[in-house]
């Protein structure tokens, strides 16, 4: 039988851990993996290690690009950082605490995740999909800014004109931009973006990375999975090269994106050179 003495304790179960996050100081690590091991089983065979003792961190105010060949573990690492996979060993910390410390609501207020695929089971409009990014802030003072943040996110992702369109009727690129707007509207200190440029044309690819750079300049921590090494060189503060589930190199683009390393990791001859006019770093496959 419950008594009045139980009520404060029961109430704390519903409120514990739901404090609103504060903006991290520039340079403060928001997300860290230590000794991360992720395994997957296929059928009755032994487990396959897809991440092997990975150490990784991202700090407020920087963009870190995850690059590497297909199957290297980029998306798996992003999913583990997001708390969507249970590691076999090691762990992930968000804002200084293990992911298990946070409720799903608390994590949604601290990091936003853009997956590779964008599916919605009902014919919500594009604006309604973007508004889903504000769900973690319901019944908080930050909900007062919902309309402004939704409008700003849609403008930034160039989807304002799609506001009334049903999400399932949009093209692949339009769906990707609406999904990005949802992540922007969520307004979290950490952004995890899995191949945000994959379905986009050249102009929108550049626009998306400029948005990520703007968020980092404003103090967000951004992790982005990319296949285009030239875009990674142009926009990332750091590049982590994954190879067979391990981090082969992690550092500034010019230190990491070298001919020798990329040729070895991608198992194809690669040429790294500077643009003759702008000096920008270019990464090109060697073609006969």
Swiss-Prot record:
Pfam annotation, one family: ABC_tran
Q: How does it sit in the membrane?
A: Peripheral membrane protein
Which InterPro entries does this one have? AAA+_ATPase, ABC_transporter-like_ATP-bd, ABC_transporter-like_CS, P-loop_NTPase
Report the sequence similarity comment from the record. Answer: Belongs to the ABC transporter superfamily. Heme (hemin) importer (TC 3.A.1.14.5) family.
The record's note on quaternary structure and interaction partners says: The complex is composed of two ATP-binding proteins (HmuV), two transmembrane proteins (HmuU) and a solute-binding protein (HmuT).
Function according to Swiss-Prot or TrEMBL: Part of the ABC transporter complex HmuTUV involved in hemin import. Responsible for energy coupling to the transport system.
This one is known as Hemin import ATP-binding protein HmuV
Question: Could you tell me which species this protein originates from?
Answer: Nocardia farcinica (strain IFM 10152)
Give the gene name.
Answer: hmuV
